[in-house]
C-alpha cells in the first residue's frame, strides 16, 4: 500500500476536482481511495506514506506523440545542413539520423527519453519510431527500456517508401510483429499501433500491404498534412486531399491517431469527426519547423478527440501547454483562444486517447483508476481552488518542478531522484552513443 498526501490535490475528476489537503491511496496498480489526508491515513494507517509537503498532487501526464529516435539530435551539428524548408529538415536532419541509428543507439535513445519523461511527470508515452539503419527488433529494444524503467508506452514503427520498397516492407513487418506481441501482453503497460510516416512517402502498394497485414484491434499512427508539400503531392499524384486518401484506404477510425493536421479543410475535419478518428497537436514542432498553425481550436470545437504531444521537442507537457496557449492566441488574434481548449486536450483528450489502447483508466485520480500519480513542488502565492486550477498550472508550474512520479503503483522518482536505474551511468552511455552517432553521420 502507498499513500501520497498532505498536498493540494487536482484529481481531473469532475465530481471531485480539488481537495485543499488531499491524499490518494494505492493498492498495487490501482487507486483505492481519494480524500482528505487524515481520513485516508486513518483507513490505511500502515501504508507507506509520501508527504507532498503542501505541493500539488495530480494524475501523471500522458504524451500523445513522441519521437524517441530524436534524442541524440540535441546539440548535433551535421556537415552541410542548411535547411530552406520542411523537406530539407526531414531529409537533412531527421532521416539522416534515423538512417544511422544502430539497435543499441535506439535502445539508449529510449532510456534517455523515458528518464526525462519520468522527471517531467510523464508516465504514458505514445511513440512514433524510425531507425531505417536497423528496423527489425527496434520496437522490442524500446520496449525493453520502457519495461526496465516502469513506464507505460504505445509503440509503432514509421512505415515509409523513402528508402526503398524492401525497407518499407520490413517496416510493415516490424509493426505487425510488435502489435501481435503487444496484444498478447497482459500487463496493460505495452501497446502497439501501425505506424506510418506520411501520405507523401507511402505508395498505394504499401497502403494495400498495410491494410492486408494489420492485425485486428489496433489503428494507425500517421503524420497528416504536417507540411504543405504533403498536401500538394497528394493532390497531384492521387487527385484528392490527404484525409480523403486515408479514408479511401480504411486508415481512419477510433483507433487511429493523426499527427499535426495543419493543412486540412472543413470537409476533412468533418470526415475525421464522422469516423471518430483521433488527432494530436504538437505546437512547438509546428512552429520550430515553420510548418504553420493547424486549425486545432476548430477541431476541438467540432468535437474531434484531440490530444497534445511534443513531437520530441520536449518531454515537458506543461511546456507544450504553454506554447499551444500562446500560439493559437497569436494566430487567431483572439485573447480568449486556447484557454479552455488546450487543458482539455492535455487532460481529457490525452486520457481518452490512452484509454483506447490501455484498459486501466488513466489521467484521473479516483477509485479504480490507474495508480499513476505525480507530486509537484508548487506553493501558490495566490489563492488556489477548483475555479482557478488551470491558471495556477499554466502560469506557475513546469516539468522540472515534479518531485515524485508514480506509474502503475511503482515509485519511479522520489524527491527528484530516479529510483529505477543508475541515471548517471545511463546518461554517460547515452553521451558516448550520441558521439558515435554524430561521428558516423559526419564521416
Where are these regions (language model features)?
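Divalent metal-coordination and catalytic microenvironments
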Residues: 7, 24, 29, 54, ...
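Glycine-enriched alpha-helix->loop->beta-strand junction motifs that scaffold or abut catalytic
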Residues: 150, 214-219, 251-254, 271-280, ...
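Alpha-helical scaffold segments that flank or form the walls of functional sites
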Residues: 76-128, 133-151, 173-185, 431-440
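His/Asp/Glu-enriched, well-ordered alpha-helical/loop segment
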Residues: 248-251, 255, 297-380, 394-398
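Active-site microenvironment of metallo-dependent hydrolases
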Residues: 1-22, 26-32, 37, 43, ...
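Active-site gating loops and adjacent loop-to-helix segments of metal-dependent hydrolytic enzymes
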Residues: 72-106, 162-164, 228-255, 275-278, ...
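Metal-coordinating catalytic core of metallo-dependent amide/deamination hydrolases
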Residues: 129, 134-262
